[in-house]
C-alpha cells in the first residue's frame, strides 16, 4: 500500500547491484525510492538485522539524513520466475554521486572522516547475534588468502606475500588489543554518496559484521586513497578528522596500515580468482588496476614510519610513552661501544647491498677485503640499515 505504486506518473529504472535487484522509482513530485529485491539466498533474519541497524543509526540526529529511511513495516516476499522467494524492502533514495565517480576535495575527505567517526560512535551501542559471523571481505581475518598466493607471479606475488606477512605481525597478533563492535563492513567508494563536496549518504549494510572498530576506517581508506596524488594529505584529511570525533588508540594506529593492505589483498585475490574463472573478461583487469597502484605505493612505506606519521596526524608523540622513554634514556650513563668516538673520526658509508659496485663480479672474500681496504683507507666504514646483503 504505497502511493507511488498507484501513480501513473512514475519512472522505473534498475540500479547497479552485485547480489540484489535494486529498482529506482521516481515520482512526478521528484521524490525517489528504492525497491530492493534480495537474492533468494539472503536469509530473512539477516535482512531484518540490516533494517534494525539502519534504524539505530538514524536515531543519531547528526546521522539521520545519511542513511535511507525504511518505508516498509515488515519484509514481504516476491516469487521470481524460478519460483524462489525473494524478500522485498522499500527505502528512500539518497540522491547524489558515488564517491568513486566524484572529484573529491579536502572538504570531501574531511566530511568522510567525520561521518565515519560518528558512525563508529553510534554503532558502539548496537549489538546483535547476526553480526557475529565469518566473512571473506573482513580485512582483520585474511589467513584464507594464503592458499591463493600462487595465483600471482613475480613482484606482484612478493607484494601479496609481504602484505600477508605484515597482516600476521600488525593485525593478527594485535587483534585482541583492538576494540570490537558492529561495523558497516563495506564503506567502499560505491557505498558512499557525495553531493557538493560533502558526504550525504552511506548505503548497503549487507556486509555488516562484528569486527575491530578501526576496520571501517581502514576499508574506506583502501578505496579513498586510490588514485590520489598526495597520500599524506588525504590521510591527514580523513584520519585526522576521524580522530577528532572518534579517538584512535595506539593499537588502532599500529594495525591501520596492515588492515588497509589486507583489504587490498582481498580485492586482488578475489579479482585473480575471477580472472581464472573468466579469462576473457577485460573489465576484471581494469577494475583491479587502482588496487595494484595503491598497494605498490604502500609496499614502499616502512610500517613503523607509517605508524609514526599517523600518530603525528593524530597529535600524538612518535611512539607510545615517548617522553617517558626519552627521559629514561637521558637518565642512564652508557659505556662506549668502541675505543673511539664515532662523532670525531673520519667515516664512510659502505654499501654491501646486492647492487653495490664492491660486489659486481661476485668477488672472493679476499678480494672484497682488498676493495674495502682501498675504499676506506684509514676511515671507519658504516653499513646501511636494512640492506639486502649478499655478504656479511
Report the location of each language-model feature.
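A conserved alpha-helical element in kinase catalytic cores
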Residues: 37-84, 102, 106-110, 368-392
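A glycine-centered beta->alpha junction motif in the catalytic cores
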Residues: 88-102, 142-151, 266-284
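An alpha-helical support segment within catalytic cores of ATP-dependent transferases
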Residues: 1-2, 125-128, 144-185, 388-390
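Active-site acidic catalytic loop and adjacent metal/ATP-binding pocket
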Residues: 18-29, 34-35, 68, 168-215, ...
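A cross-family kinase active-site recognition segment
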Residues: 101-156, 180
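Active-site activation/catalytic loop segments of kinase-like enzymes and analogous catalytic loops
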Residues: 214-247, 263-279
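ATP-binding glycine-rich phosphate-binding loop
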Residues: 5-26, 326-334, 363-391
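ATP/Mg2+ or Mg2+-diphosphate-binding catalytic cores
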Residues: 267-360
Amino acid at each position: 500500500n504505497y502511493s507511488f505504486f498507484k501513480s501513473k506518473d512514475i519512472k522505473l529504472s534498475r540500479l547497479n547491484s552485485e547480489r540484489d535487484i535494486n529498482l529506482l522509482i521516481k515520482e512526478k513530485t521528484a521524490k525517489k525510492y528504492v525497491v530492493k529485491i534480495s537474492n533468494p539466498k539472503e536469509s530473512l533474519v539477516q535482512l531484518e538485522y540490516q533494517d534494525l541497524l539502519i534504524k539505530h543509526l538514524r536515531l543519531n540526529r547528526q546521522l539521520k539524513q545519511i542513511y535511507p529511511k525504511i518505508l516498509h513495516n515488515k519484509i514481504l516476499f516476491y516469487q521470481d520466475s524460478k519460483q524462489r522467494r525473494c524478500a522485498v524492502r522499500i527505502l528512500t533514495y539518497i540522491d547524489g554521486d558515488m564517491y568513486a565517480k566524484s572529484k573529491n576535495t579536502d572538504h570531501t575527505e574531511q566530511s568522510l572522516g567525520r561521518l565515519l567517526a560518528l558512525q563508529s560512535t553510534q554503532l558502539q551501542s548496537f549489538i546483535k547475534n547476526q553480526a557475529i559471523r565469518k566473512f571473506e571481505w573482513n580485512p582483520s581475518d585474511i589467513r584464507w588468502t594464503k592458499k591463493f598466493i600462487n595465483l600471482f607471479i613475480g613482484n606482484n606475488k612478493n607484494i601479496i606475500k609481504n602484505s600477508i606477512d605484515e597482516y600476521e605481525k600488525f593485525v593478527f597478533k594485535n587483534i585482541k588489543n583492538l576494540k570490537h563492535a558492529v561495523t558497516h563492513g563495506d564503506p567502499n567508494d560505491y557505498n558512499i554518496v557525495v553531493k557538493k563536496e560533502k558526504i550525504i549518504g552511506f548505503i548497503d549494510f549487507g556486509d555488516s559484521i562484528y569486527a575491530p572498530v578501526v576496520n571501517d576506517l581502514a576499508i574506506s581508506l583502501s578505496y579513498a586513497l586510490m588514485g590520489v596524488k598526495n597520500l599524506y594529505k588525504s590521510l591527514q584529511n580523513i584520519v585526522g578528522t576521524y580522530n577528532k570525533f572518534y579517538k584512535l588508540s595506539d593499537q588502532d594506529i599500529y594495525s591501520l596500515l596492515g588492515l588497509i593492505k589486507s583489504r587490498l589483498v582481498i580485492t586482488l585475490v578475489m579479482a585473480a580468482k575471477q580472472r581464472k574463472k573468466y579469462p576473457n573478461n577485460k573489465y576484471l583487469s581494469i577494475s583491479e588496476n587502482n588496487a595494484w597502484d595503491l598497494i605498490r605505493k604502500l609496499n614502499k612505506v616502512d610500517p613503523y614510519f607509517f605508524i609514526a606519521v599517523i600518530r603525528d596526524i593524530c597529535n600524538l608523540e612518535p611512539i607510545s610513552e615517548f617522553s617517558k622513554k626519552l627521559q629514561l634514556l637521558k637518565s642512564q650513563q652508557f659505556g662506549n661501544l668502541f675505543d673511539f668516538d664515532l662523532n670525531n673520526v673520519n667515516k664512510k658509508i659502505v654499501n654491501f647491498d646486492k647492487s653495490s659496485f664492491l660486489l659486481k663480479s661476485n668477488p672472493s672474500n679476499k678480494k672484497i677485503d682488498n676493495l674495502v681496504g682501498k675504499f676506506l683507507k684509514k676511515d671507519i666504514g658504516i653499513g646501511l640499515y636494512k640492506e639486502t646483503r649478499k655478504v656479511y
